[in-house]
């Protein structure tokens, strides 16, 4: 109701990566979101995880507020400037041994004054 811009919520330890909008009623995401949320996985969880699990399409279809979901291990890197917030999802292809390769799986930007995710 207060229409506050630039609201970003960071959470973690979900063992998955997520990015999406937050609405007052998440079951009916209509209009502009009230905030943006980034959920980061942990880098030290058991198992290598996967980019997209078997239920990916179904899960995304019933959660239209989400713009990204990934189950690989890693971390997020966030940068805030006066004009844009940027979040990078860094993931490893495996953590089960030391040969895992780190990559940037997805990057999102939020322009100042907005509560909308944009792939960067």
Predicted feature locations:
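Long, structured stretches of catalytic cores involved in phosphate-ester chemistry, encompassing
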Residues: 1-120
